[in-house]
């Protein structure tokens, strides 16, 4: 699994011209699921995202997590995070999981993340054409991959 975690002032998802979900201060998490991903990897990623200390403390130092600040969260599926641009100029998405793997993994991530942070997590709709708006705060953007835990 690969995620892009963005600290936001606010974020929203619109589908078909209708507002689907929105959050205030917190995290927007874009999640890409790889064909070879397993549920055992999900727990590491959930805990890492929930506990990332990327919010400022009283001294202006990024030392607080989403849990510490009581922020909101939104998780949006994004298979393009697994694009390969190794050959040619057209990205290949062959590593991205198909629906039969990706949907249950996405739903499990959302469910576990919601449990971890103790509140409902806003989402997009898997596979939908979505317009995602955000005000990136900082900007602070962190990329993580369960296959390369740096």
Question: Can you say where each PLM-predicted feature lies in the sequence?
Answer:
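A short, compositionally biased micro-patch
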Residues: 6-8, 69, 135-137
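Compact, glycine-rich, soluble single-domain proteins
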Residues: 18-70, 77, 81-111, 116, ...
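Short basic, glycine-rich beta-strand/loop surfaces that mediate nucleic-acid
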Residues: 28-32, 135-142
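Short, low-complexity, polybasic intrinsically disordered segments
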Residues: 95-96, 137-150
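Short, active-site-adjacent segments that bind or coordinate small-molecule cofactors and metal centers
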Residues: 122-139
């Amino acid at each position: 699994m690969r995620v892009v975690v963005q600290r936001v002032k606010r974020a929203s998802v619109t589908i078909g011209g209708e507002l689907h979900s929105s959050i205030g201060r917190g995290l927007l998490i874009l999640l890409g699921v790889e064909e070879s991903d397993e549920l055992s990897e999900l727990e590491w990623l959930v805990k890492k995202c929930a506990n990332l200390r990327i919010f400022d403390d009283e001294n202006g130092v990024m030392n607080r997590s989403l849990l510490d600040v009581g922020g909101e969260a939104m998780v949006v599926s994004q298979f393009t995070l697994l694009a390969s641009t190794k050959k040619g100029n057209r990205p290949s998405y062959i590593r991205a999981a198909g629906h039969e793997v990706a949907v249950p993994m996405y739903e499990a991530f959302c469910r576990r993340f919601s449990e971890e942070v103790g509140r409902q997590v806003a989402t997009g709709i898997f596979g939908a054409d979505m317009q995602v708006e955000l005000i990136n705060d900082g900007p602070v953007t962190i990329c993580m991959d369960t296959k390369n835990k740096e």
